[in-house]
Regions:
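Non-catalytic, topology-defining segments of multipass membrane proteins
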Residues: 1-82, 92, 117-225, 291-363
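Active-site-flanking alpha-helical
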Residues: 61, 97, 101-102, 254, ...
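Membrane-embedded alpha-helical segments that form the functional core of polytopic membrane enzymes
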Residues: 67-93, 110, 114-124, 229-236, ...
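Transmembrane alpha-helical segments that form the membrane-embedded catalytic/substrate-channel core
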Residues: 83-93, 122, 167-173, 227-255, ...
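Histidine-centered catalytic micro-motifs
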Residues: 89-99, 126-138, 242-249, 273-289
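Aspartate-rich (DDxxD/NDxxD/DxxxD) Mg2+/diphosphate-binding motifs
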Residues: 91-110, 138-146
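Active-site-proximal inter-transmembrane loops
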Residues: 185-193, 257-279
């Protein structure tokens, strides 16, 4: 395939459309309709429980950090607060953006807006970028949420464990959105009817961040920014760690989530922070199944999926060598083995690279 162009205006995006890749039908494991209906049933109870616990912990940790400010005892409070602010907000943004976390619509919307502010994402633009991520997952030039591009820029990945590049890219976008609406790239996936909302959201976010900075200046202390803003940097490591494992080192330009997504078994604390998104093949295959039902879905369809990685460490041990290989060979990827009970991958399509050869299925 050669060097990839991730721009939505580049040749890879054009080839993806012309080849039919963007309109292709994705593989789904067969699940009985009655079972799927039960899995997709929404409930307020699990999300209310988890949300009260999350915000309760954040409040307690922030109070502890404020009361111990100026001493070393303050550090553990802010480190824990930061992970909940800078990482748990990512999964809440994600699930509530799908509208599946709560049964009650306004609850999804409220938590989605709060989480979008915390994770430094415009709630209007990112709702649409994530829709594209699901419809064209890791299709080069089309998916705006490809976290691990080829070749991998390892320094950028490392710095993003502290949210550095996310924040650097957020600030100019925030200012552009606030005063000029969506950027040129954002206009490729955000409907024109939403452009005004993009600007309104950006103005609100900008006002809140300016207020926090003004309070910090008035107090002569960074304490207000330890509560709002800075946790997006010092607490980002968990959501970056888990986010890299979603698709890192796997195939791009395919239509089978078993090839481009990864399920990883995680400890209960990480699963709470990540809201069960460690079941990532399952989530991409059936995105309308709520987070609390993903463990059940996994048990039902696991015989049709690659074996999950047994831990975060095991997943990184698998992914890291692949990322290093991609520094030299952009077309290298890990192909996950399927159990004997699974339906096979469609080799005719998965060997296809847009622009190089025509897929056998289309001949």
């Amino acid at each position: 395939m050669g060097k990839r162009d991730y721009s939505p205006f580049g040749p890879d995006a054009k080839r993806a459309v012309e080849s039919g890749l963007t309109a292709a039908e994705w593989y789904h494991t067969d699940v009985p309709r009655k079972v799927m209906k039960d899995l997709m049933a929404r409930s307020d109870r699990p999300a209310i429980r988890d949300t009260v616990l999350l915000y309760g912990l954040m409040l307690a940790l922030a109070v502890g950090g404020i009361l111990t400010w100026g001493s070393l005892w303050t550090l553990p409070f802010w480190l824990a607060y930061g992970v909940l602010y800078g990482s748990a907000s990512d999964s809440r943004w994600h699930e509530c953006g799908h509208g599946t976390a709560f049964r009650t619509s306004w609850m999804n919307k409220a938590v989605y807006e709060i989480s979008s502010f915390m994770i430094m994402r415009n709630s209007a633009t990112w709702r649409w970028s994530h829709a594209r991520h699901h419809s064209e997952t890791y299709v080069v030039g089309r998916d705006p949420e490809i976290a691990v591009m080829r070749p991998t820029v390892l320094a950028k990945l490392m710095l993003n464990f502290f949210g550095v590049f996310d924040v650097i890219s957020f600030v100019p976008k925030l200012i552009h959105n606030a005063f000029a609406g969506p950027t040129r790239v954002e206009k490729t996936f955000v409907p024109q009817s939403e452009w005004g909302k993009v600007q309104r959201v950006a103005l609100i976010h900008l006002a809140l961040y300016l207020a926090a900075m003004a309070l910090a200046v008035w107090m002569g202390s960074i304490l207000p920014l330890m509560v709002v803003g800075l946790p997006r940097l010092y607490g980002a490591w968990h959501h970056v760690m888990t986010g890299l494992l979603q698709h890192g080192g796997l195939a791009d330009n395919v239509i089978d989530h078993r090839l481009n997504s990864r399920t990883v078994y995680m400890n209960p604390v990480s699963r709470f922070i990540y809201w069960n998104m460690n079941y990532h093949v399952e989530h991409h295959m059936f995105p309308m199944v709520p987070y609390h039902a993903l463990p059940r879905l996994h048990q039902i369809i696991k015989d049709d999926l690659p074996a999950p990685n047994l831990s975060i460490a095991a997943a990184f041990a698998e992914m890291w060598p692949a990322l290093k290989q991609q520094l030299k060979y952009e077309d290298y990827f890990l192909k996950r083995d399927l159990p004997a009970s699974a339906k096979p991958y469609r080799e005719d399509f998965h060997l296809y690279v847009p622009g190089i050869m025509a897929p056998n299925a289309a001949e």
